[in-house]
Amino acid sequence: MFVKDGCSECSTRVKALQAQKQPFDVYMVGSQNDDERIRNWAITSGIDPANVRTRQITLNHDGGRWLGLSLGGDLPAVVREVNGQWLRQ
Protein backbone atom coordinates (compact mmCIF):
# COMPACT_ATOMS: atom_id res chain seq x y z
CA MET A 1 0.00 0.00 0.00
CA PHE A 2 1.30 3.44 -0.94
CA VAL A 3 0.45 6.34 1.37
CA LYS A 4 1.52 9.91 2.05
CA ASP A 5 1.69 12.04 5.17
CA GLY A 6 -1.35 14.22 5.85
CA CYS A 7 -3.73 11.92 3.97
CA SER A 8 -6.77 11.04 6.10
CA GLU A 9 -8.03 8.60 3.47
CA CYS A 10 -4.67 6.78 3.69
CA SER A 11 -5.16 6.32 7.44
CA THR A 12 -8.73 5.08 6.94
CA ARG A 13 -7.62 2.55 4.33
CA VAL A 14 -4.77 1.28 6.52
CA LYS A 15 -7.18 0.73 9.42
CA ALA A 16 -9.51 -1.25 7.14
CA LEU A 17 -6.66 -3.43 5.86
CA GLN A 18 -5.35 -4.00 9.38
CA ALA A 19 -8.83 -5.12 10.50
CA GLN A 20 -8.72 -7.86 7.83
CA LYS A 21 -5.73 -9.39 9.66
CA GLN A 22 -3.83 -9.84 6.39
CA PRO A 23 -0.13 -8.96 6.13
CA PHE A 24 0.73 -5.93 4.03
CA ASP A 25 3.54 -3.49 3.32
CA VAL A 26 3.20 0.28 3.68
CA TYR A 27 5.34 2.52 1.48
CA MET A 28 5.32 6.21 2.36
CA VAL A 29 5.69 8.48 -0.65
CA GLY A 30 7.66 11.64 0.11
CA SER A 31 9.08 10.37 3.41
CA GLN A 32 12.55 11.73 2.56
CA ASN A 33 14.04 8.65 4.27
CA ASP A 34 12.87 9.99 7.65
CA ASP A 35 12.10 6.97 9.86
CA GLU A 36 10.55 9.17 12.55
CA ARG A 37 8.09 10.57 10.01
CA ILE A 38 6.89 7.08 9.08
CA ARG A 39 6.67 6.01 12.73
CA ASN A 40 4.63 9.09 13.66
CA TRP A 41 2.31 8.53 10.70
CA ALA A 42 1.83 4.89 11.71
CA ILE A 43 1.00 5.86 15.30
CA THR A 44 -1.51 8.54 14.30
CA SER A 45 -3.02 6.19 11.69
CA GLY A 46 -3.71 3.56 14.33
CA ILE A 47 -1.28 0.88 13.19
CA ASP A 48 -0.82 -1.61 16.01
CA PRO A 49 2.89 -1.67 16.97
CA ALA A 50 2.57 -5.42 17.63
CA ASN A 51 1.74 -5.93 13.94
CA VAL A 52 4.92 -4.07 12.99
CA ARG A 53 7.05 -6.02 15.48
CA THR A 54 5.80 -9.33 14.06
CA ARG A 55 6.22 -7.97 10.49
CA GLN A 56 2.52 -8.51 9.78
CA ILE A 57 2.75 -4.88 8.63
CA THR A 58 6.00 -3.39 7.35
CA LEU A 59 6.75 0.34 7.23
CA ASN A 60 8.94 1.43 4.33
CA HIS A 61 10.22 4.47 2.50
CA ASP A 62 8.83 4.59 -1.03
CA GLY A 63 12.24 5.29 -2.58
CA GLY A 64 10.67 6.05 -5.97
CA ARG A 65 8.70 2.80 -6.23
CA TRP A 66 5.35 4.57 -6.71
CA LEU A 67 6.63 6.56 -9.68
CA GLY A 68 8.37 3.47 -11.05
CA LEU A 69 5.10 1.52 -11.15
CA SER A 70 3.52 4.21 -13.36
CA LEU A 71 0.04 3.43 -12.03
CA GLY A 72 -0.98 7.05 -11.53
CA GLY A 73 -3.93 8.32 -9.53
CA ASP A 74 -4.24 9.60 -6.02
CA LEU A 75 -3.07 7.99 -2.82
CA PRO A 76 -3.77 5.77 -1.01
CA ALA A 77 -3.10 3.01 -3.49
CA VAL A 78 -3.39 -0.66 -2.70
CA VAL A 79 -1.50 -2.62 -5.35
CA ARG A 80 -0.91 -6.30 -5.94
CA GLU A 81 1.33 -8.20 -8.28
CA VAL A 82 -0.72 -10.40 -10.61
CA ASN A 83 1.09 -12.55 -13.18
CA GLY A 84 4.17 -10.34 -12.96
CA GLN A 85 2.23 -7.09 -13.38
CA TRP A 86 1.37 -4.57 -10.66
CA LEU A 87 -2.31 -3.61 -10.51
CA ARG A 88 -4.28 -1.19 -8.35
CA GLN A 89 -6.92 -2.84 -6.20
Where in the sequence are the language-model features?
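A short, hydrophobic beta-strand/beta-hairpin element that forms part of a small beta-sheet core
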Residues: 73-88
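Thiol-based oxidoreductase modules, predominantly thioredoxin-like and allied folds used
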Residues: 24-39, 51-62
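Solvent-exposed coil/turn segments that connect beta secondary-structure elements
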Residues: 4-6, 31-32, 83
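Short, internal strand/loop/helix patches
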Residues: 45-74
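Short, surface-exposed basic-aromatic patches at helix termini and helix-loop junctions that form
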Residues: 16-22, 42-47
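Conserved redox-active cysteine motifs that mediate thiol-disulfide chemistry
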Residues: 1-15
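Extracytoplasmic/secreted cell-surface and envelope-processing proteins
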Residues: 10, 36-37, 89
